[in-house]
C-alpha cells in the first residue's frame, strides 16, 4: 500500500469541502495512515466461513395480532374538542394566506 502524502490529505479535504489549516495537515496525514493500516489488517482476516450480513445483531419486527375493539363514537370525540365546526375539529390558523 502506498503511503499517504500531505497532497493526498489536501485533496481529500478539498473533495469534502473542508478548510483544513496547513498546521493540521501532518496530523491528518498520520491519522489516515493509521486508519489505512488498520483496514489492511482487516483485509488479512479469513472470512470465507462468515456469511454476509448487514447488521451485528438480528433485527426482527415485533408485532401483535389485530384485535377488534370498541372505540368512542364520532360525536363523543368531536365533543371533546375545544372548538369544532360541524364534523371537524377547529384549530388555530398557523399559516398566512
Swiss-Prot record:
It comes from Prochlorococcus marinus (strain MIT 9313). PANTHER family: GLUTAMYL-TRNA(GLN) AMIDOTRANSFERASE SUBUNIT C, MITOCHONDRIAL. Gene3D superfamilies: Glu-tRNAGln amidotransferase C subunit, N-terminal domain. It catalyses: L-glutamyl-tRNA(Gln) + L-glutamine + ATP + H2O = L-glutaminyl-tRNA(Gln) + L-glutamate + ADP + phosphate + H(+); L-aspartyl-tRNA(Asn) + L-glutamine + ATP + H2O = L-asparaginyl-tRNA(Asn) + L-glutamate + ADP + phosphate + 2 H(+). Allows the formation of correctly charged Asn-tRNA(Asn) or Gln-tRNA(Gln) through the transamidation of misacylated Asp-tRNA(Asn) or Glu-tRNA(Gln) in organisms which lack either or both of asparaginyl-tRNA or glutaminyl-tRNA synthetases. The reaction takes place in the presence of glutamine and ATP through an activated phospho-Asp-tRNA(Asn) or phospho-Glu-tRNA(Gln). One of its GO terms (biological process) is regulation of translational fidelity. Belongs to the GatC family. Disulfide bonds: none annotated. The gene is gatC. The lineage of its organism: Bacteria, Bacillati, Cyanobacteriota, Cyanophyceae, Synechococcales. InterPro entries: Asp/Glu-ADT_sf_sub_c, GatC. This is Aspartyl/glutamyl-tRNA(Asn/Gln) amidotransferase subunit C. GO terms for molecular function: asparaginyl-tRNA synthase (glutamine-hydrolyzing) activity; ATP binding; glutaminyl-tRNA synthase (glutamine-hydrolyzing) activity. Heterotrimer of A, B and C subunits. Its EC number is 6.3.5.-. HAMAP family: GatC (MF_00122). Pfam families: GatC (PF02686). Keywords: ATP-binding, Ligase, Nucleotide-binding, Protein biosynthesis.
